[in-house]
Each structure stands twice: as structure tokens, then as C-alpha cells.
Amino acid sequence: MRTQMRIRLSVMMFLEYFIWGVWYVTLGTWLGEQLHFSGQQIGFAAGTTAVGAMLSPFLAGLLADEFFATQNLLAALHGIGGVLLWYASTRKEFGIFYAVLLLYSLCYMPTMALTNSLSFRHMRDPRQEFGSIRVLGTAGWIVAGLIIGFLHVEPTAIPMRLAAGSSVLMAIYCLTLPNTPPLGSASELKLKHIFPAESVSLFKDKAFSVFAAASFLICIPLQFYYAFTNPYLNEIGVQNAAGKMTMGQMSELLFMLAIPWFFRKLGVKRTLMLGMLAWVLRYAAFAYGNNGALVWLLYFGIVVHGICYDFFFVTGQIYVDRKAPPALRAAAQGLITFITYGAGMFIGSWLSGKVVDMYVKSSTLGIVAHTWRSIWLVPAAGSAVVLILFALGFRDNEARFSTSRSTQAAPASE
């Protein structure tokens, strides 16, 4: 891949994840402190991206493959999304805010798959080249958090408006990207185009079924972290919470490099279990940490994000890639994404909000406080149950396998 093309794709990835990272992390803090939304309302708002993740395979797959050039579709989605996000930042009524944010998520979430597919189309060797491009997305998320923390604007609408402006900028930039026309011919939208019936046959394999069930279940407590970590840290007085939370993405980059070694030493099952164990330890650390002598527990809970994500989700992506026949790999990955980031996190958004509302203390002067230890022990217990069930139920003959092909293209979490 030529240097010029590498730079163009890297800028695209940086902007793609800067947009998401600049508003999503601090959303709960703004909604809770300034708009006084309930925990359940905050959870539902954070869960709009899960709805987008469930529907994005239809939008991203068929529209780009059959009807529109990818760069033009990206420009349209980001342009419309920027307008919607700005409008959402001006609303104070939950009903209207939620509806607009949901529409925005339906525009944004497909763009992650579209930026990946556009990159693949312009690479000579995607397996070797994609990783070095995709890492700029994580860098964009990190820079977004550092900027918001530095500006001290977490409990305001500024992060969302900055994301809206960045989205419009991204729309303009997408029009400069290399032409990526559709490869197929127009056809009607059908579920079988996205999830072929053959992909369901993977569930006949007991090990795959257990893995899929565990992936779904672990994503339910996952939403506690994404929706309520920033409000939690701000409520207990941690300064520059958004900036400090970027340590999680920094550790993610480091632990990504360690995955091949752990595969060789532990195999797939124990690597997956280590990832789930990290979730248990993280939530326990949040439950018992504080902004005083035990502040190190909070930092531990943030830094362990690299293990939480890489050792379960990236490992899981590689496992699916190895289990599925070549013709079904894309469909299988889409199915797992639907199960995890779609259905699992959608349920998690509802449950996390309900739990947070259960442990609201009496408010004074309009300031709402929470019994955070009780809140964090719920996802800790849930993650522990999933870990135990997975340990007892997962049996796979392919205990160890090479990661040379799959780790290059595994997307990083934010």
C-alpha cells in the first residue's frame, strides 16, 4: 500500500472513532448532572448504539455492496448524523432526545463497518496492513478523551456538539476518499443476504453455542462500564475522569500484542476465561475503590480494560474466524456482533439503568448520589456467573491455534 493511501485511510479511521469517543464516554455525566435524567433513561440513551449495531449489518452490507459507492454513503451518513447529533444536544426532553439520538446511532453505527470495507478494498494485503490502519481509530478515541478531560466539559453539551462538528468534517473528508463503487448488482433487501441460513449451522457445534451464549451474557454487565463509569468517577470527585479513562484504550493496545503469546501458553478457553475474570475484578475494584487511599483500585479497574476487551472479544473474533468455513466467516462475525454489541448490550442498557435507579440516595439541592458499591457488585456477580458457566460448559478440541491471520484484522474496542 502506498504511503499516500495509508495516510488517507489512517485519517479516516482517526476521525471515525474520534467522533464516537468524544461524546459517548461522558454522555451519562451530562444527562445525569445537567438534564437530571434517571439511571434508566441514561441506560436507554447509551443503548441506542446497540440498536444501531443490530441493524447496521443490513444498512452497511447491502447498501454499499449493491447500490452506493462506499465513500458517498459514508459522507451522507456522517453529514446527516452530524446534524442529528447537534440537534440532540439542544433537547432537554428525554422522549425527543432519545428519538433523535436513536436516529443518529442508525446513521453512525453502519459507518464502522463501511470504513473497514473501504480500507480492505484499497489494500494489497489486508491481513498485514489493516491492523496498522485500524490502530489509528483507537488513537482517535484516546485523543478525544484527553481533549474532553483537558477542557473540563464533561457535564456539558460541548462533547456532543464537538462530535457533531467532527461528523460534518468527516462527511466532507469522505468525499475526498478514493472511489469505492458497489461490486454487486441491485437486489431486494433480505435477511439471508446478511445472515445466510448456513451460518446458523454453526450452532450445531456445542462449543460454538456455549461461546455465543457466553458472549451474549457477558455483554449485559458490559454496559454498566460503558454507560456509568464516567458518571461514577465524576460523582466521587475524580478529576479529569474522561482523560484518565483513556488509560483503558492505551492498555488495550499493549495487551493486543500479548494475545499471540497467551494463545500459545493458555489456549483459547483459558484466554477467554482470563478476559471474563478481568471483568469480575474490574467491577469489584470499582465497588471497593474510592478517591482516597484506595484510588489505585479505580486505576486498576480502568487499566484492566485491555485484558477485558482483548482477551475476550478479540479472542472471540479470532475463534469465530477459525471455526467458521471461509464462505461463512463474514456472516458469522456479523451474527456474533448482532448477539453481543446488539442484543447483549441493549439488554444491558436497560438492566444497568434499572440497577442504578435502585441505589439512588436521597438527593440534596438537586444533586443525586448513589450507593455505587451496591451498583458495581451487580455486574461483578453477573460476570462471575458467566465465567463459571463458561468454564463448565465450553469444550473445544481446537485448544490452541495460530493467530497470524486473524489478529491483523481484529477491530479494537473503544
Regions found by a protein language model. Name each.
Residues 150-166, 354-383:
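A membrane-interface helix-boundary motif in multi-pass transporters
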Residues 2-50, 207-245, 313, 349:
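Helix-loop boundary and gating motifs at the non-cytosolic
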Residues 1-3, 178-213:
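Juxtamembrane intracellular "pre-TM" segments in multi-pass secondary transporters
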Residues 37-48, 128-133, 138, 158-161, ...:
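Loop-to-transmembrane helix entry
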Residues 55-69, 151-153, 254-268, 356-357:
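Helix-to-loop junctions at the C-terminal end of transmembrane segments
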Residues 88-90, 169-179, 375-414:
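Multi-pass alpha-helical transporter architecture, strongest
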Residues 72-86, 270-285:
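Structural signature of the two symmetry-related core transmembrane helices
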Residues 14, 84, 94-114, 118, ...:
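Hydrophobic core of transmembrane alpha-helices in multi-pass small-molecule transporters
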